[in-house]
Amino acid sequence: MIPKIIHFCWLSGDKYPELVQKCISSWKKTMPDFQIICWTTENFDINSNTFVREAVACKKWAFASDYIRLYALYHYGGIYIDSDVFVFKSFEPFLANRAFSSVEYCISSNCYTCNIEAAILGSEK
């Protein structure tokens, strides 16, 4: 079972922009009994992984978070959500699964695609 933990990354140390504040508020509103862990350079040892260290040194926050999100899910389990994702409905129904990922559909007159996304991922520890 997936634990009630929401993970997200904020590595720049900057104040959250208004969009990110609204997104985090949406998580708290839709999943009030979930623990929220914000991964930063203070609580993740960026020197523990060469890729993360180099990404942070170049201020490539999204690259570093690609590793950290998987680290968090592997070691703690829970749900990783990108900081710019607004949630309208609880993910509680997904907790009975061992893992899940998000998908993005693109439907237009000349193409139809379905991409697996890493913006929202969930897994057991």
Where are these regions (language model features)?
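Aromatic-acidic/polar surface patches that form glycan- and anion
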Residues: 13-20, 58-66
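An acidic/histidine-cluster motif and surrounding catalytic segment
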Residues: 31, 38, 46-63, 94
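GT-A fold catalytic core of metal-dependent nucleotide-sugar glycosyltransferases
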Residues: 62-116, 120
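Short, low-complexity, polar/charged sequence segments that are solvent-exposed and flexible
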Residues: 25-29, 55-58, 120-122
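N-terminal anchoring/stem segment of glycosyltransferases
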Residues: 1-49, 125
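Generic recognition of cysteine residues
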Residues: 9, 23, 38, 58, ...
